[in-house]
Amino acid sequence: GGWKVTIHGPLELVRYLESCYSVTGQRAFDAEFWGDQTYEREMRIIHAPTPADMPVAADGAGSAVALDWKGWRIGFDLGASDRKVAVAKDGKLALRPDGEPVLSEEYVWDPRPQTNIQWHFDHIMEILKEAEKAIKAIDPNARVEAIGGSSAGVYVNGRVRVASLFRGITPRERFDREAAPIFQNIQKAWGIPLRLENDGDVTALAGSIALNDGAVLGLAMGSSLAGGYVDEHRAIKGWMNELAFAPVDYNPRAAVDEWSRDFGVGANYFSQQAVARLIPLAGIDMPDIPADAFPLRLKRVQDLMAAGDARARKIYETIGVYFGYSVAHYCDFYKPVRHIEVLGRVVTGEGGQVILDKAKDVIRREFPELLNINFYEPDEREKRHGQAAAAASLPLT
């Protein structure tokens, strides 16, 4: 992500890109997204006449994560339909003597239609207080040392910039005033370190902790595509890994995303809507299920797959081919990648194995240099507890 792009190259090319990334250009959506929405600056494309005029590269080491911390911490994960919270101690999920977590719970909520930011604040504080109560029940003298959180959306320096959880807070001026600083306000209320990161990156961190290794690209195929990455040092890079809106298909006739109006983006190829798009092409008719009921349509395909239906298998094989080529494409940008963590409803059941087998087949034939990549699926325990517990490792104290 960034609001300023500096290019040393032909002036005509830079002028052309400048016109594309303007309020009236063909990339107006991106110009607004990366400019005012994300970085609160106007997006600029700048020409560097000579190599000496180029700024020094700042790829950087990313943002370190300490995995060997001591004391009590709280980790949370905010989704569209539930809030997860976990208690962690001395670098890992805190367990009772019987091996069960001290606290690792899901609490239902419906934040998107809410128009009062106090509602969001209170509901997040509620789960943090529940976690503190669980800690105090074990050790009345204990002190929460830090809080880490993960949430869908774009966050810059702890401020909310783009997040569907707060879509009810409008117009934009009110969003910037009330929603943007919500996590900074929660941190002030607790008076201890609090760090929030994108949920895709925290998913990759959870995978890295489970695998005890770095260089993990996490991909979740659900209602959309979520992505995240931790490098070989297990650092979160601070990149905008919004792979749902990054193109994987450059065919001009590729499916168009309804939000960004871009074509060929990951959300249309690795999600429930990708399955729904392939259903008629596979020759499957579902007159009893509305066309936009993607979860129900996916469930029907999963049932057909379990019953041995060859048409359903074709859908998963097709997504597997997409996936094989896209993995190779992603590996041009994410370096190194030793593990790819795959999760989400689309890869649940027999069909998920077909997707992975087909993807590996594509990689074997087309990209043998990537054969050593390990595809990893988290187990049920990690899915339930891993994300919130990993989030607890985010703050550096």
Range-by-range predicted roles:
Residues 1, 230-231, 241, 245-262, ...:
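Helical "lid/coupling" subdomains associated with nucleotide-phosphate turnover
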Residues 1, 16, 24-30, 59-72, ...:
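Glycine/GP-enriched mid-protein hinge/lid loop-to-helix segment characteristic of carbohydrate kinases
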Residues 2-10, 141-152, 334-346:
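Short glycine-rich phosphate-binding loop at a beta-alpha junction
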Residues 8-10, 79, 90, 97-102, ...:
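Short loop/turn segments at strand-loop or loop-helix junctions that form parts
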Residues 9-10, 68-70, 76-82, 219-224, ...:
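A short acidic Gly-Thr/Ser loop motif
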Residues 11-50, 106-129, 142-147, 153-216, ...:
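Glycine-rich phosphate-binding loop and adjoining helix at the ATP-binding site
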Residues 125-146, 327-339:
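Phosphate/pyrophosphate-binding loops at sites that engage ATP/ADP/AMP, CoA/4′-phosphopantetheine
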